[in-house]
């Protein structure tokens, strides 16, 4: 089968790999669509992120969907021909965090397309993926291109779960990449009264508008605009920080009301924070990492049409044009979510 393999920064190759044999409880999924994630771009551009580095060739990809081609004899939950989204989260289910109901914090997580462990966990950008049947969420309406959005949407659903109720809240979203745009869509679905989104590029802000943002602010052109929400100790109930930028976080703290919540979703470096403000305003600052059980909900919402994420899709490329696809995904002015078709 064909696979998209990263060897080093900018060294992306289409290689033949053997299809694994089916084991008990497993299925073979013929992959049809795969979304390029920010982590895929980090491997492509830099060979990793933070302290995580490529140490061997690795198949990229974890935002994947396709059709079941074959099932093991003991599999009953899916059948050949089913269209499915594949959950890339594979916790061990027996470590102390799994046993406490925190599978996203699993000590032995085998998340697709990850160079954290050695050997690396190979990803899903391949013609055929053999996986556990329990990883497959069956869909009846949505095409594979929409179902491949379930993984990043699950990330966002988990983050908003960390935020608490959004009903009637004014929500600020800082950073409008694919995750920030999905936060906008999910916040609207969760009953936010007003959604303000900020970025330094106009094009992704236009997509956020289509997904439900009430106000989209280019802070490069209007650097002082968010500050107007700082009156009377702050007018924002919930802030979701998606940029990983210290200035965005600090600026957001100025406008979040007392006892408001800040969810840190974007990955960045170490930052210094005004602790006196955290104390005086009794701010709740929480992190959000990956997802697990939210994946099934994400698939259900997409498949039933209760939420429309198609404005996020800005480009598709056949897998043989993987280099062009990654180049397009790198251009924030022309692309939000780029997908590969297999």
Question: Where is each model-derived feature located?
Answer:
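C-terminal hydrophobic helical "lid"/dimerization subdomain
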Residues: 3, 250, 292, 296-342
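Glycine-rich beta-strand-centered segment in the early N-terminal region that forms part
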Residues: 20-34, 48-99, 140-142
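Short glycine-centered segments of the SAM/dcSAM-binding site in methyltransferase folds
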Residues: 83, 170, 260-261, 284
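NAD(P)H dinucleotide-binding glycine-rich loop of Rossmann-like/cofactor-binding domains
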Residues: 94-174
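Adenosine-nucleotide cofactor-binding segment
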Residues: 173-176, 186-251
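N-terminal Rossmann-fold NAD(P) dinucleotide-binding loop
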Residues: 180-181
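Helix-to-beta-strand junctions that scaffold the AdoMet/dcAdoMet cofactor pocket
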Residues: 256-257
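Rossmann-fold dehydrogenase core element
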Residues: 261-263, 273-312
